[in-house]
Amino acid sequence: MAPTVVHVAPHPDYEAVGCPGALLHLRDRGWQVVSVIASLGFPEQRDRRRAEAEEASRRAGFVPVFLDPPLDISVGDDLALATVRVAIEVPEIVAEYDASIVVSPSPHDVHHGHEVVGRGVQQSMATLPSGLRWWMWGVWGDLPAPNVFYAFGEEDLARMLHILEAYQGELERNDFRRLLAGRATANAVLGSERVSVSARPPPAPSPTPRC
């Protein structure tokens, strides 16, 4: 049975924006990638955004799973209730697919909807097997201490852009292709530097008091 990673996207298209390089890297090495879509936007958008997410999953080779009903995570919604739903429903999905890794936005990703999903996954970890790993990504806010870096090339980026382009309705609103390519360019320089800095041990205490 193939090992499984569950990615929890706060909105459709973030499976193609958050950390698509790492997900595709696992997919290419035999992992099953379960793409959980937590919300579908405003009611009048839901049919379109679900269809776009299904097409993106087809392009990526991911298994799409939609929370039902979709989360309401706009400003003014009951974000505490949405957090509880994530904390309850993610373990059920992890158990169904026997996942080894859960991936989500950081609980500190600045965007309120991203943080709802991140906090919900964080709470769910208390009920999940101790051997399961939780990976976080940051888009709206940088991770404070990143410890995983996956380098990829232009062909990989073109593949990610092809997946993202399934979201034509969202790209008309805001061209996230520029964000995906720009983050890749920036992290080609900063990524390994930030991971190596985070991995350094703290300085040893001074053997003698210093004032």
Predicted ranges, named:
Residues 1-132, 165, 182-186:
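Active-site beta-strand->loop->alpha-helix modules in alpha/beta enzyme cores, enriched
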